[in-house]
């Protein structure tokens, strides 16, 4: 996994849980370092996860479309969007641009295999 560039995306749904953004970032950053993955950008936002218009998702799309990342690291699939159809549409964008989405669970398995 070395020499791969990743975008770390963290999201919570309301300000009362904003402290969990730091936890998500720390966990994903530690796993990426263990695997030799280069984190080139981090987005932490409070958003409901119901649309593509958030600042963090727009920034993430920019990195994907401009081929600046190979991986997107997220805590779990619901951190991107809460609706399956939006997650599926986002995955299409990633597939088209050869970007892989990895959750914290995926990363933990990969670190065990190293």
Language-model segments: residues:
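Short, structured surface patches at the beginning of a domain
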Residues: 1-114
């Amino acid at each position: 996994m070395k020499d791969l560039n990743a975008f770390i995306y963290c999201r919570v749904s309301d300000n009362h849980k904003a402290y969990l953004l730091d936890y998500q970032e720390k966990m994903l950053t530690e796993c990426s370092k263990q695997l030799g993955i280069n984190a080139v950008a981090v987005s932490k936002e409070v958003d409901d996860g119901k649309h593509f218009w958030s600042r963090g998702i727009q920034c993430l799309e920019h990195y994907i479309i401009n081929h600046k990342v190979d991986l997107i690291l997220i805590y779990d699939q619901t951190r991107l969007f809460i609706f399956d159809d939006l997650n599926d549409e986002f995955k299409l964008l990633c597939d088209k641009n050869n970007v892989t989405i990895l959750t914290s669970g995926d990363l933990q398995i990969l670190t065990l295999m190293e």
